[in-house]
Amino acid sequence: MNDKEMSIEEQIKAFETAANAAATAVPKESILGKTAAEILEMVSSYASDAQVFYRKGDLVNAFAAAAYGLGWLDCGGYLGYMNTGISGCPALESAFPAELMEKLEEKTYRYQRMLTGALKAVSKAPDKETVAAAAASEIFGTVTSGLTDGDTFLPKDMVNALCIFSYWYGWLDCGVRAGLFVITGDRHLFTI
């Protein structure tokens, strides 16, 4: 998690800027290019969703969508599919409108359960002697640590807990799409 806190509005704008600047880093006609295009499509879709939710006043879904999309973008950069570096999970100001707290709490605990289930529903796909296996291990370990980090914010800071759960869920989902993990459990937990 980044040290500097930002507002939800700043987080959404920063993600939108990063998403608009993103491009694939591999030849489009290649197998890797097809996966890169899928990653970029997910990033673009979630940047658009975040803006739509924000304009409608749905701050909960707006910042969760931006965090999830940023997870996809950062994982895509880490894996070499995208031309980006890794931004990291943003730290958000924890102040939140009282009238949205019930929705925030419900979504935060739902994403905690979903990420927990998603981690249990995958296994590493690549052979253990490959670089891809090392990447899968790194992603799995980092996402697991992210889940633990998010748990430490509960129940006092639902904003940052949801941001963390959403961000690391994006990483795991991107790893599945990139072929680093095979789904052994509930496929509905992934966008595959």
List PLM regions with ranges.
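Long, charged/polar, soluble alpha-helical segments
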Residues: M1-I192
